[in-house]
Curated annotation (Swiss-Prot):
Keyword match Flavoprotein: yes
UniProt keyword annotations, A-Z: Chloroplast, FAD, Flavoprotein, Lyase, Plastid, Transit peptide
Catalyzed reactions per annotation: a long-chain fatty acid + hnu + H(+) = a long-chain alkane + CO2; hnu + hexadecanoate + H(+) = pentadecane + CO2
Protein name: Fatty acid photodecarboxylase, chloroplastic
Biological processes annotated in GO: glycine betaine biosynthetic process from choline
SUPFAM superfamilies found in the cross-reference section: FAD-linked reductases, C-terminal domain, FAD/NAD(P)-binding domain
InterPro entries hit by this protein: FAD/NAD-bd_sf (IPR036188), GMC_OxRdtase (IPR012132), GMC_OxRdtase_N (IPR000172), GMC_OxRtase_C (IPR007867)
Activity control, per UniProt: Activated by blue light and repressed by red light.
GO molecular function: choline dehydrogenase activity; flavin adenine dinucleotide binding; lyase activity
Length: 611
């Protein structure tokens, strides 16, 4: 629904002029401009300036603005997350490579991946990637956090922050919370192929796992993945944290505002932030959001943009900064290093003709790709059915070797045959099919993610221009163990697909195809088709000392060498958790907000007893 131009006072500072809120359709998304009438952010000073309006920022904005004496500003480059494609889980098919709500980023050319660039989906809206991800809610395992080896961040330390943040709809349940803002629930879409997949997985020896977030038992097994949804609607942090706080007079949100630099003054007592420079358009004026005395800048731009902006502001490896003519404020070699992700591959099989209609897309579209009114009605009146799913909320966590202490593989099961072995491109190809009036074929897809990959990449500078994307070296398979994991993953997926009762539905394997039979064949297939699981972390890692590559202190998330500057987003995670990273990002933000407000740490009340 389009909104006409109007003036509102939502979020206006008491005594300030009302904000103009003009809505217009841009690239299929409603763009909502929220800003002070006197200028993009006005002339007032802020206690907290949040750079980026993504997953962590929305949490912080809510929690910090709860103190009416603190003025909080959020700067977000993209639009709001109000678009229908964001709210409806099935709208994910329209969000990949979206011209407005995605950053459109790719890695540098990867020689080891047959000279391919890897597309990296990054949400560009209020809510960030929590508004464009698969809505899967996974914390990883207790062992993931214990492996960090950081005081205050063990599994015992973080567990109650996970529970505090959560509002689990199907509770009460052990290891889950019901009083938080982060809505979670069990999937609200069922397909006969889900049960057949479970039976086939059981036939290979996998156990059933009733709750992948219950740390009282191992992560292994097959089952439903809990989702970040509320009654079938996406529950990103924009909806669950930021929107409920928007009426507060001490909170200001500016969209279409791209941060270009953190302003840092160097003095005799050291370096300190004074504010943030930003632009409303690439070649337009630059504005400054100024800090009040004692104020802080909180970097919440994610694992790509946070290190990028730190380097542009003089915080990073001195050699890199000097190469691009940037004055060095704090020589931190770890900025942009330690990039980690979940590399993914696909196994897909086409259904026999009599079972073509079992795919999730066949429940939404007819043979000519016209949307079915029944699916729409089911969603509108029940908030259930194929529109209530991103397609991959059932699956398994598996160990590809008996020597492993915990799963290294996540299988995401999709009732439908992938159109391209690059899982992301399947959605783009589907868009072309829709234009031609052709449907997505029936069958199954198993997206296979190396969830505890060892390879590490980096974020660097291409230029000292904030509007030129950084150099992203994703560096998959720099550790050959990750390639071996995915080779074994394809073999395990084939084993499951060959079991009854799943086997009876399938006609032929389309990807990688039966001709890819040897390990060498599978390695070649994976190098040509591996894609991102969109779980980037680690590029401003927390730790005890910059000498060990840390960028921020694990004690308080402060950037080493700069006063008034902290990082609160997925880039601080020193090692990637074995599951989707949204839950861990919210956990970090909840804890950071409590730290900033001087609130006591929650005393751990649960003891994880298994990995």
């Amino acid at each position: 629904m389009m909104l006409g131009p109007k003036t509102v006072t939502r979020g206006a500072t008491k005594g300030a002029a009302p904000r103009s809120m003009a809505a217009r359709r841009v690239g299929g998304a409603r763009r909502l401009s929220v800003r002070a009438a006197a200028g993009p952010a006005g002339s007032e000073k802020f206690d907290y300036v949040l750079v980026g309006g993504g997953t962590a920022s929305c949490v912080l904005a809510n929690k910090l603005s709860a103190d009416g004496n603190k003025k909080v500003l959020v700067l977000e480059a993209g639009p709001t997350g109000d678009a229908m494609e964001v709210a409806v889980p099935a709208g994910i098919t329209r969000l990949f490579a979206h011209p407005v709500m995605d950053w459109g980023m790719s890695s540098l050319t990867q020689k080891q991946l047959v000279a391919r660039e890897i597309y990296l989906a990054r949400g560009r809206m209020l809510g960030g990637s929590s508004g464009s991800n698969a809505t899967l809610y996974h914390r990883g395992s207790a062992a993931d956090y214990d492996a960090w080896g950081l005081e205050g961040w063990s599994s015992k330390d973080v567990l109650d922050w996970f529970v505090k943040a959560e509002c689990y709809a199907d509770g009460p349940k052990p290891y889950h919370g019901t009083g938080g803002s982060m809505n979670t629930e069990q999937p609200r879409y069922e397909n006969v192929l889900h049960d057949e997949f479970f039976k086939a997985a059981a036939a290979t020896g996998l156990p059933a796992n009733p709750d992948f977030n219950d740390w009282s038992h191992p992560q292994d097994g097959f089952g439903e993945f809990q989702v970040s949804q509320k009654k079938g609607q996406r529950a990103d942090t924009y909806r669950t944290y930021l929107k409920p706080a928007m009426a507060r007079g001490n909170l200001k949100v500016v969209i279409g505002a791209r941060a270009t630099k953190v302003n840092i003054e160097k003095g005799s007592s050291g370096a300190r932030t004074t504010g943030v420079e930003y632009a409303m358009q690439q070649f337009g004026d630059r504005f400054t959001a100024e800090l009040a005395p004692g104020g802080e800048v909180l970097m919440c731009s994610g694992a790509v943009h946070t290190p990028h902006l730190l380097m542009l502001s003089g915080v990073g490896p001195a050699a890199t900064l000097k190469e691009h003519g940037i004055d060095v404020v704090s020589d931190l070699s770890g900025v942009g290093q330690n990039l980690q992700d979940h590399p993914a591959a696909v196994l897909a099989a086409r259904a026999k003709p009599e079972f073509e209609k079992l795919s999730v897309t066949s429940e939404v579209y007819d043979d000519k790709c016209n949307i079915k009114l029944g699916a729409v009605a089911q969603y509108l009146f029940q908030r259930r059915g194929p529109l209530a799913t991103t397609g991959c909320d059932h699956g398994a966590f598996v160990r590809t070797s008996s020597s492993l202490s915990q799963p290294d593989l996540q299988m995401r099961f999709v009732p439908g045959c992938a159109l391209d072995p690059d899982g992301v491109k399947s959605y783009i190809v589907f868009g072309e099919l829709k234009k031609q009036g052709r449907a997505w074929p029936g069958g199954i897809t198993l997206q296979l993610l190396a969830i505890r990959a060892k390879s590490k990449g980096s974020i660097g500078l291409k230029a000292a221009d904030p509007f030129i994307n950084p150099a992203i070296n994703i560096n998959y398979f720099s550790d050959p163990a990750d390639l071996a994991t995915l080779v074994n993953a394809v073999k395990m997926a084939r084993k499951i697909a060959a079991q009854e009762p799943l086997k009876k539905y399938l006609q032929e394997e389309t990807f990688p195809g039966e001709r890819a039979s040897s390990d060498k064949d599978l390695e070649e297939y994976i190098r040509r088709t591996v894609h991102s699981g969109n779980a980037l972390v680690g590029t401003a890692a927390m730790g005890a000392s910059p000498a060990a590559g840390a960028v921020v202190s694990s004690a308080d998330l402060k950037v080493f060498g700069v006063e008034g500057l902290r990082v609160v987003d997925a880039s601080v995670l020193p090692r990637i958790p074995g599951g989707q990273t949204g839950a861990a990002t919210v956990m970090v933000a909840e804890r950071a907000a409590a730290l900033l407000r001087g609130q006591a740490t929650i005393a751990p009340s649960r003891q994880p007893v298994a990995v």
